[in-house]
């Protein structure tokens, strides 16, 4: 043995959308630590630049909105020009704001479905021509589509479609050996959570979690690494829930 430690994604090329904060940023850092070159996206240039600086190496930032097909074309043109192929795609860009049924507007509906459903679909579609056979596609779901949290109907519905995507695409891509799975987190302590929920609401959420606490972004990142790597070589077409047991009881 030569003592060289090989990372789980050594030499791989990964694309992670919406990776300027939270779980996806933690995942990008972990993927790089495990040997990948990672392309990350974000809508705001200042946040994207900060994320690239934080990751520090083997990372390319591409500004863009995953709901904008022109931006997606520019993303994958950059990947093709710089690396030529993709091994891992984590379609993590998403959006959601709470609205009770009587508060839902067309704009609210279109924003959620435009990014979470439409954006995810076209992200995967436009990535596939660059995919190496045997690669891994991960989509970020939400346990809101299973738990029925009041006020989250549009968000829950826009995330539930990804389970259908995963099942069908796993079948469609079987001849290329490309796996497609959904990573579904529950409540995770991120800046977005701080923005959306007050302390009382967060304590209420924590009371529903058998693990007794919100997850950390780094904990979800390790699940993404599992799905991205050969550790999950026989895992395909599923929804892997990492929510501390919330949906299990």
Residue ranges and their predicted role:
Residues 13, 20-21:
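Conserved glycine-rich cofactor-binding loop
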Residues 100-101, 105-113, 193, 205:
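Substrate-binding pocket helix/loop in short-chain dehydrogenase/reductase
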Residues 90, 174, 179, 235-237:
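Short, small/polar-rich loop/turn modules that mediate ligand/substrate recognition or access, typified
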């Amino acid at each position: 043995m030569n003592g060289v430690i090989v990372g789980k994604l050594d030499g791989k090329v990964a694309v992670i959308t919406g990776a300027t904060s939270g779980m996806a940023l933690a995942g990008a850092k972990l993927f790089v630590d495990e040997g990948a070159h990672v392309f990350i996206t974000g809508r705001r240039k200042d946040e994207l630049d900060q994320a690239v600086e934080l990751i520090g190496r083997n990372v390319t930032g591409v500004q863009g909105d995953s709901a904008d097909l022109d931006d997606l074309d520019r993303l994958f043109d950059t990947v093709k020009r710089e690396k030529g192929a993709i091994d891992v795609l984590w379609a993590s860009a998403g959006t959601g704001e709470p609205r009770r049924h009587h508060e839902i507007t067309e704009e609210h509906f279109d924003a959620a479905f435009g990014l979470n459903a439409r954006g995810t679909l076209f992200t995967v579609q436009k990535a596939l021509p660059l995919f190496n056979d045997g690669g891994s596609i991960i989509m970020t779901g939400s346990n809101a589509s299973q738990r029925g949290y009041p006020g989250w109907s549009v968000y829950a519905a826009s995330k539930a479609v990804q389970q259908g995507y995963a099942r069908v695409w796993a079948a469609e891509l079987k001849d290329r050996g490309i796996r497609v799975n959904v990573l579904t987190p529950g409540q995770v302590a991120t800046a977005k959570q701080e923005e959306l929920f007050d302390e009382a609401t967060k304590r209420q959420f924590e009371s529903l979690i058998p693990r007794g606490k919100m997850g950390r972004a780094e904990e979800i990142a390790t699940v993404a690494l599992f799905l991205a790597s050969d550790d999950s070589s026989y895992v395909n077409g599923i929804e892997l829930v990492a929510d501390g047991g919330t949906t299990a009881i």
